[in-house]
Amino acid sequence: RLVANGPTNQLVTWLNDPAAQDPAIAGGKGSALARMTEKGMPVPDGFVVTSGAFLMSASFQLLQALTPILRASATDTDAIGEASEHAMAAIASSPINPMLIDAISEAYKTMGGDAVSVRSSATAEDMADASFAGQYDSFLNILTFDNMVQGVRDVWASLYSTRAIAYRIQSGVPNSSVGMAVVVQRQIHPDASGVMFTRDPVTGANRFVVSAALGLGEGVVAGEAPADRVELDPNTGAAIKTEVVSKDAMVAALPEGSTSRVGVPEWRRLQPALGERSLVRLSELARQLEAMFGGPQDIEFAVVDEEVHLLQSRPITTLDDVEPTDATEWDGWVDPKFSWAQSFLGVFAGPVYQLQLDVADAFSDGMRQCFEETGAERTRNHIMTLVNDFVYVRVPEIDADVLAGG
């Protein structure tokens, strides 16, 4: 593991330097990685091009371009688009200070000049009420110093993309107060990668939910690769539910740099992306991250030879919209005159998702309409009902004599 070299440079700082734990210096992603590094968690080595370096590189043309942004509303798409174009052009055309080039070069050489990832880390991101996930650009498998510097410049420019400007306005984050740090880390070449939520982001249930694909994690984040889904007991790490899909594609690093979506050999497609050892380790780290950051986390990870590497941890921002519910009593939800069964013919075998509920509702409504048209009037819960996220279906009654006879 690399160590911080002397006093913190105002332009570049290492992830294991205490100064990098300040979001005002290293941005949201960088400061979280620095805190994880301090605790000895498996974070790839790296350094941060600080928000101060970004401010030093800001040109007069950029400052001019920001003026209309400060007056725009989230729905003023024309004004936002024009301001975005001018701001990004100003960043692309402004020379980078030679002092910063030297600082980045020294850090890059210290890391050995190997392949790196260049990732955004804005000073206002990954907050409890606004994640900014996907708003800024990041670049993987950068092989040369010049391309890395260009990646830093492109990350800066993404701070002023139309979607980022509009999202900040919508989230109440002043465009005048946000800066951009850049995290440069040693590139991991994983067997599998993915995301892990320490609460179900849809239902708020207390379980760990893992989505994992083969290759690089962009396959999961961008939806470019099929992903397995595993639900884990948060206390033991034991699998509650596992869905292994056919993974015919993945995102992989290319020998010439950058990444691409590639095919997966047929023999590997139905193998689980993650082994039991990796899932247990992920659960251990997830519990530590929840304790460290004080709440449910959205975690990005990569796995090499079943060893887990942490790439990011941020608060889950969707839970405020989830209303936790107590266990539903049977009374009032099912007609006691009939028999009911869960997992009828294998349909709705586990806790259901909202899309499945919508399908079930339409199915139930259609059946009820058929009964009404044939004169067999029935209420909605004569056919199908939902109790504690499980679908129950009415089944044929069994004569008591049959039950008594075994």
Residue ranges and their predicted role:
Residues 1-183, 192, 268-278, 282-294, ...:
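N-terminal beta-alpha lobe that positions the nucleotide/phosphoryl donor
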